[in-house]
Amino acid sequence: GDVQRMSAGTGILHSEYNASEAESVHLLQIWILPETTGLEPGYEQTHFTVGDRQGRLRLVGSRDGREGSVTIHQDVNLYAAVLADGDTVTQDFGPGRSLSVQVARGAVHL
């Protein structure tokens, strides 16, 4: 459950690696263009437990950092969920909004 936000802004050096020789790492990178250019480079990381995401959509990224989510420089809301067989979640995204779903394990019906 960690969510990281990295803003390259005017420039940043970055690499991804697994420091553990015993445990595998699973990650999902989502690239979102900022709504303005020339921002200072920045980094933010927040941990969300399984309980935070169990059976519900948990806001993990937003423009204003509400509900403890990481701050994203764009009009976007990112949600994470851990769902069991038969779980149902509902979210009203409002008119004119787009939706993208990433399933890390299992299957969903939309």
Regions found by a protein language model. Give the residues of each.
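Conserved short histidine dyad/triad with adjacent acidic residue
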Residues: M6-G11, S62-E67, N77-P95
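A contiguous pocket-lining binding segment that forms or flanks enzyme active sites
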Residues: L28-V70
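Ligand-binding loop in jelly-roll beta-barrel domains
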Residues: A8-G38
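Generic beta-strand structural signal
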Residues: D2-Q4, I12-H14, H26-I30, R56-R58, ...
